[in-house]
Amino acid sequence: MASGQQERSELDRMAREGETVVPGGTGGKTLEAQEHLAEGRSRGGQTRKEQLGEEGYREMGHKGGETRKEQLGEEGYREMGHKGGETRKEQLGEEGYREMGHKGGETRKEQMGEEGYREMGRKGGLSTMNESGGERAAREGIDIDESKFKTKS
């Protein structure tokens, strides 16, 4: 029990030094403030999703991502994503990060179905540093059935 309190004290110290220690708690000056901010932002997001519907909410997020990509440029946007991934890896540890990725892959396979997931992997496997999987497939005449990529309803 004491170790849980020690951990909270350490997180609070880090928050007071300006570090974000709670996902969604950016701007909070203490651990408790960051927890409250994260909770409020989460509730706000849920409310907005209910207002717009699932598809509208997803589209709004997509447009926001595209705007950010235009602001930062392709390279800056990619770098931002890389830094976010590295930060998450530090938070979860190597094993936790790997497990999170594995669970995400399993979830995606369930959403798409085995055949669609395999077809998407085929396309991804064709990619190189200089060419996307789709570009290489087109150049080499490899048929990729992207209709299989659809998420099951």
From Swiss-Prot:
Domain of life assignment: Eukaryota
Annotated region described as 4 X 20 AA tandem repeats, given as residue ranges: 43-122
Compositionally biased intervals (Basic and acidic residues): 7-19, 32-122, 133-153
Keywords: Repeat, Stress response
Induction annotation: By abscisic acid (ABA) and osmotic stress.
Statement: the UniProt record of this protein carries the keyword Repeat: yes
Pfam families for the chain: LEA_5 (PF00477)
Transmembrane domains' residue ranges: none
Entry-linked InterPro entries: LEA_5, Sm_Hydphi_plant_seed_CS, Small_hydrophilic_seed_prot
Cell membrane keyword on record: no
Role summary: Lea proteins are late embryonic proteins abundant in higher plant seed embryos.
Protein family membership: Belongs to the small hydrophilic plant seed protein family.
Protein's UniProt name: Late embryogenesis abundant protein B19.4
